[in-house]
Amino acid sequence: MKFNFKLILIILIINQILIINCKENKILEIYKSGNICPYPLHYRERTGSDDHDFDLGFVYARNDSNCLLPCPSPIYTSQEVNTLSLMIKITGTISFIASLILLLIYSPLINRMGYNRHTIGIFFLTFSVFLIMLTDIIYVHHGNDLICPQSHRYSRQNDSGCTITGILFQYGCIAAVLFWATLSLDLYLTLKKISTKKVEKWYLIILTLIALILTFVPLVKKSYGYLVTGLACWILDSTDQIIFFWAPFTAILGIGSILIVLVVYEIYKISKITKQNRGIFQSHIRPLLMVLFIFGQFLFILAFNALINNKYDEYSARMDSYIDCLFSSSSYSYLCRLKTFPFEMEFIVLFFLRLIGIEVLIFYGFTQQTKKILLHSFLVNNIFFKKYFIRLDGASLDFSTVDEELKVVNFSCNNNNNNNNSNSNSNSNLNNNLNNNLNNNNLNNNNNLNNLNNLNINNNLKNSQNNLNNSQQNEPLSSQKLSENGNVNVFMVESFDNNNSMINQFKHLEEKNNIILNSIISPVQEEQYEEDEINNKNINNNSNNDENN
């Protein structure tokens, strides 16, 4: 009896297993041919052409089913997607602002010093990084809708957002690595003291054309879209990726690495010669570090892509196992896990890519070259900055037009006039004449005044001499004339004393405003002021002569 009970129990268990397997097989058949798909897959009837469905953004889990993969891709958990999204929004925004600041500084809007091989490379490298970071700003604005227009459809080139971000990302990456190599070449040519002014515009045109060709040929082929394994709109076909990105990217990176070795060798030779040349060595450390930093990041991206391609078959097998798990365990599909790309490495690659904008600002935004550009720009050379900000030590601040200089000179002189008028009301006419001469830079008036003063003094001297000669013949008359002439001389002495007093007061005020006057007086104005000072000295000499007489 005991034996029969065990046998019955075994039969029941086997029967239950068979029933479950039968149900699972039926469910699997339903999934393959019916309108039901396990979570998170979604049912969609095929149109008959897999390529057409793929071009529309629909990716089926299996070739023999109507179940679509979810969007975003199941290779990342929801927590990992949120982590990547948050990192992209924060670092992408900061890097975008940093690259925008440096781009404006080196743009023709602010840079009035012209361009050379070095500044051209910085401007276009920054512009390329700016375009890459701009795709992050677009993503911040649209969110996951930019990647997934629908819950189970991936964005394609037909979607405007994908087209724009795809072009910006592809051109930005290609141009960035091209102009990075250009800066490496510039560093080497600078050390070798080789000039390339005649060919600068040509290599700029050639590099831009290369980047445009590698960007718009995939656009003509309608190759842009969001991959199941990606987080950006980029080239879909793996062959096109190699032709239009990875092959030129690797070649340019190889050329750049050779240039880096040559630069390090040249710097080593310079550092071994003399202490004077060590200053040259130190001046090239910052550009070299920038080139090395970007080289390391580009190299890491290349290594990550090589790792993905090397393990592509393994990752594809894991994806197939995940799909099988979903179909075979429909009631427990949430237990199925997909583990393909290493999330940590993906995070580091995306993070390093977004650090480039911050790095270009740190390495190129705080240099003597950038300081000179700012000091010669309208941002510094304006009345508001002169009035409310302290002038930088050792800086030579210039204005773009003489009119702006004269406005500031008149502003300073008018303030001095007000102070002089308040200190000396009794001599207001003389003070106004002097200030008007300085404000209007009227050299002719000063010369006329000097001539008139000299003429009056000479006349007075002659009259005094005549009176002295005739004093013995006509004492009453001579005394009267000497008294009159003496009054005239006293008046002239007092007038010139007042004139000297006002000149000294103006000089005292001019010393107080020395920072403003030194930074804005043009060469023409300096010459006029020197002539005015000579005239003032002549007036002082005439006054002293009059007193002696």
Swiss-Prot record:
The lineage of its organism: Eukaryota, Amoebozoa, Evosea, Eumycetozoa, Dictyostelia. GO terms for cellular component: membrane. It comes from Dictyostelium discoideum (Social amoeba). Its main location: membrane. One of its GO terms (biological process) is cell surface receptor signaling pathway. This is Frizzled/smoothened-like sans CRD protein A. Glycans are attached at N63, N158. Residues 432-475 form a coiled coil. Residues 417-483, 528-549 are annotated as: Disordered. The chain crosses the membrane at residues 90-110, 120-140, 163-183, 199-219, 242-262, 288-308, 347-367. Residues 417-474, 536-549 have a biased composition (Low complexity).
